[in-house]
Amino acid sequence: MAEAGGAGSPALPPAPPHGSPRTLATAAGSSASCGPATAVAAAGTAEGPGGGGSARIAVKKAQLRSAPRAKKLEKLGVYSACKAEESCKCNGWKNPNPSPTPPRGDLQQIIVSLTESCRSCSHALAAHVSHLENVSEEEMDRLLGIVLDVEYLFTCVHKEEDADTKQVYFYLFKLLRKSILQRGKPVVEGSLEKKPPFEKPSIEQGVNNFVQYKFSHLPSKERQTTIELAKMFLNRINYWHLEAPSQRRLRSPNDDISGYKENYTRWLCYCNVPQFCDSLPRYETTKVFGRTLLRSVFTIMRRQLLEQARQEKDKLPLEKRTLILTHFPKFLSMLEEEVYSQNSPIWDQDFLSASSRTSPLGIQTVISPPVTGTALFSSNSTSHEQINGGRTSPGCRGSSGLEANPGEKRKMNNSHAPEEAKRSRVMGDIPVELINEVMSTITDPAGMLGPETNFLSAHSARDEAARLEERRGVIEFHVVGNSLNQKPNKKILMWLVGLQNVFSHQLPRMPKEYITRLVFDPKHKTLALIKDGRVIGGICFRMFPSQGFTEIVFCAVTSNEQVKGYGTHLMNHLKEYHIKHEILNFLTYADEYAIGYFKKQGFSKEIKIPKTKYVGYIKDYEGATLMGCELNPQIPYTEFSVIIKKQKEIIKKLIERKQAQIRKVYPGLSCFKDGVRQIPIESIPGIRETGWKPSGKEKSKEPKDPEQLYSTLKNILQQVKNHPNAWPFMEPVKRTEAPGYYEVIRFPMDLKTMSERLRNRYYVSKKLFMADLQRVFTNCKEYNPPESEYYKCASILEKFFFSKIKEAGLIDK
């Protein structure tokens, strides 16, 4: 950076050598990687802001601002023109004795005297900074902040491969360089003369309008849940990384690239780059862009968000998992219709005034999305309402879902906190990158070969057709019940009568009076299946929370609507409803005609709960068989068949990839023709080349005595912690120091956590211990650039670790 040109057209120093694109050529020796736009995937990414670069820049700025004034003047002199003589054309002071290698930090460098001569013009440093003699510390700190931003952008210019992005980086580089020379504030001009907001209504206002338009009629608790979903969506847009125009041109050649390029440039200048260069004013994407940008990213963003949600579901609390996996897809589908609709009212300029006349809800206060966190789903989990008879339960309502108490301040629930995110990974697992690559193929219709899949295949899941109908709004599910405490709702009463008729018609051996008594009993509830406004099926049940089970009394679907998957989907909704209410056991008496159905839904004649729990509570039926079903709270039952299908597709694609890698083809086995019934797997020709390993062949070297293993691992871990290069890995990475770290690193690990695990006797084998410590090094190298000090520490410590486990005899030397 010491060779930078003047204000009008700064000349960049030569680019790093071809073989080292990540080499940083800044005067400060920054180890920060470039901004998030440098690693944009072909369809955009949902990574956290700055990729950790913003934290590193903030640390360097704090260090520099706390330095002595002489050090600050030296730094600013590099970017200040010489004023000794009018004829001197030197644009920046050059240190005559530059360090041969970048030191560990700026503050460790020797402070240069103001009388030190410039290597270029031979004038003193004082001649370059004479205009800064009477400048306040506050102004000097502001200029120093711009200096570090310039150096960071300089790195980005050289590292960026996309021409459009590089051009924007270079423009901002020149803008900030000029601001330093002229001591002014950077103002984006030129082709970007239009100032934010660029379109009205904004994305935030449009989503506000959408919530008002679609959900204002709901009770406050149900509406609050929708608001939480909207907050999650807006938060993700604010940290969404747009794909470069060149990538979009390849993916969608028929799109309006010129319009997208304009929005992309604005997004870089006003939203993205200011995340890590805070000398530029920053705007939230949702506040300055509108429908046009949202349309260009919504489809791919929706797909990736849902996929990421499914991948991270195990990290989420039960309530939030149900909210995200069950209700977030429905929310996005409804919003998608309004985004691409030509006449949706949510994008009208006068929607605010029109809605204020019809709704008591203040549209301005519906959603106020925070831009403080980068977790994928930052909305807090919500509480549940005990269902009152005579009203529909939001627990199974497709348009809303869970409820949250209005007016109650919810604490931030960091689902990606370090403690929660520490998940052990199975040894030999398939790399996440490969899974994501396969997922992008099987979820992208353009990437799949073969016939169209508009129609259901012969091997579709039983509930697939019903699930599709629910998404299209053809069918609905509502938990209903009678009430003695309040005036019954007319619609609910009509549905209860409809349920009575369905049960009576489909269960002719059951007395009609008995059916009527139970359906209208306030202690019983019914999950009703509604199609075209009328009841076509349902499951009547009674919950016993104190006993930990629910009794299923009636279950039926009208005869002309059977064999469509409604029964399976109905039961899956009932399972998810009970998971929300933390009741994980079903009991029912099934007659000879119903046993087959209940077996398909996971029921068994083996009852898992003690007999004392249900005797005297459940109704006994002569000639019927008692069956039970235990629910797994980690399974999203309404999407379970989709997940299984997706897993099968992934395995199939992975097998195809492996087959393509194996060039040699072996003849088929002929031994079975000779009467051989069985052969060892390892004797199959080519089996080892596929990556298969015999489980019994690897002789473990680890000590058989648990105490001996504990002592050995404790000794190794202590030596690793005492190593001089172990300092970056002693504690979990803090979010404040590295924003976006837990978006990049899925399985964090540190030496403190390992010490706790060792103390709790978690490491029952050497493999678990080695996997955790290897994860420490892998995470560091994945997040930090190769030339950074953290990366070097990880490499040195990794070699030391392997030398120690070899000395301990845990692996072959």
From Swiss-Prot:
It catalyses: L-lysyl-[histone] + acetyl-CoA = N(6)-acetyl-L-lysyl-[histone] + CoA + H(+); L-lysyl-[protein] + acetyl-CoA = N(6)-acetyl-L-lysyl-[protein] + CoA + H(+); spermidine + acetyl-CoA = N(8)-acetylspermidine + CoA + H(+). GO terms for molecular function: acetyltransferase activity; chromatin binding; cyclin-dependent protein serine/threonine kinase inhibitor activity; diamine N-acetyltransferase activity; DNA-binding transcription factor binding; histone acetyltransferase activity; histone acetyltransferase binding; histone deacetylase binding. Gene3D superfamilies: 3.40.630.30, Bromodomain-like (1.20.920.10). PROSITE patterns: BROMODOMAIN_1 (PS00633), BROMODOMAIN_2 (PS50014), GNAT (PS51186). Disruption phenotype: No visible phenotype. Residues 1-55, 380-423 are annotated as: Disordered. It is found in: Nucleus; Cytoplasm, Cytoskeleton, Microtubule organizing center, Centrosome. The keyword Transcription regulation applies. The active site is at E551 (proton donor/acceptor). Residues 380-391 have a biased composition (Polar residues). It is an enzyme of class 2 (transferase). One of its GO terms (cellular component) is nucleoplasm. It comes from the Eukaryota. It holds the Pfam family PCAF_N. Interacts with BCAS3. Interacts with SIRT1. Interacts with EP300, CREBBP and DDX17. Component of a large chromatin remodeling complex, at least composed of MYSM1, KAT2B/PCAF, RBM10 and KIF11/TRIP5. Interacts with KLF1; the interaction does not acetylate KLF1 and there is no enhancement of its transactivational activity. Interacts with NFE4. Interacts with MECOM. Interacts with NR2C2 (hypophosphorylated and unsumoylated form); the interaction promotes the transactivation activity of NR2C2. Interacts with NFE4. Interacts with MECOM. This is Histone acetyltransferase KAT2B. It comes from Mus musculus (Mouse). The gene is Kat2b.
